[in-house]
Amino acid sequence: MNTQIDIRELNERIQRESSFVDLITMEMNKVIVGQKHMMERLLIGLLANGHILLEGVPGLAKTLAIKSLAHTIDAKFSRIQFTPDLLPADLLGTMIYSQKKEEFVVKKGPVFANFILADEINRAPAKVQSALLEAMQERQVTIGEQTYKLDEPFLVMATQNPIEQEGTYPLPEAQVDRFLMKVVIQYPNKEEEKLILRQQIDENILTTNTVLKPQEIINARKVVKEVYLDEKIENYITDIVFATRYPSEYKLEKFKTMINYGASPRATINLALTAQAFAFIKRRGYVIPEDIRAVAHDVLRHRIGLTYEAEAENITSTDIINEILNTIEVP
């Protein structure tokens, strides 16, 4: 079996199968200026079948991004504003009595959609957060005695405002670990902001067109898992994750007292999956070290627990990941 020929064939196949990525990107660029990192991560989440936790101040096109993506693939979109008085039933649905039928009927909640924007997830109590996170994990919801499967594709993008912390309920570490990525989004640059301004003044506001069907995304996910991961790349992934747990073994002794707990095995799996999806988006049939480095921060930043000492010295998980990537030998 000639591996070289196999990889060449796989590469050609991926190039064919991933052509829709350009169509989606083109459509989304009509309505969203800048925010390339966020849009790319949304696509990775969609293709790797994982959910995204987004951190950024209000007004950075988070709602518009996921709504536009849903429209381009003809999927159902639902926005849930999390508030302190929200109940799990407001999210999942409930049994209501129908006088006409003289029986209880199911009224499904907003979680029954392909794309969910869970806005300011840290504003709702733990009971509501865990109801959403359970739906994310199980891909099904139980109302009364009946269990209902959620539609595929199913992507949750939860947002957190990094500034307002009053009246918030921080997500527990175990819950945060369920997110494939935590993406931190920044302000647009000056040129992008001018374009946003012009776009709002222009009366001919552009809208996205539907260029794909949900089933095509489901099919693409199977292809993403076929993207080739060499053993050297697997070793590179495990070394990066293990360095968050045992920094001293990787010449990172200075972080021994800074890290309270390292990334879980889920991080290893997700690092591989996101790298495969990233390679797919770049129209490549194999993963290279640069793919791992490109997604490492998003996959690991919410999975490293810092000690009080790290916080006192203003050491962030980003600093630790940067140091790990600079220290671990690239294959």
Positions of the model-derived regions?
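Walker A/P-loop
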Residues: 46-83
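Conserved AAA+/SF3 P-loop NTPase catalytic/coupling segment centered on the Walker-B
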Residues: 89, 110-137, 151, 166-175, ...
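A short beta-strand-to-loop transition that corresponds to the Sensor-1 phosphate-sensing loop
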Residues: 120, 154, 158-163, 185-188, ...
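C-terminal engagement/docking regions of AAA+ P-loop ATPases
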Residues: 1-9, 14-15, 247-331
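Pre-Walker A (pre-P-loop) alpha-helix and adjacent loop at the N terminus of AAA/AAA+ ATPase modules
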Residues: 14-60, 242
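AAA+/SF3 P-loop NTPase mechanochemical coupling elements
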Residues: 105-114, 143-160, 171-180
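Conserved C-terminal "switch" segment of AAA+ ATPases
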Residues: 13-18, 31, 168, 182-255, ...
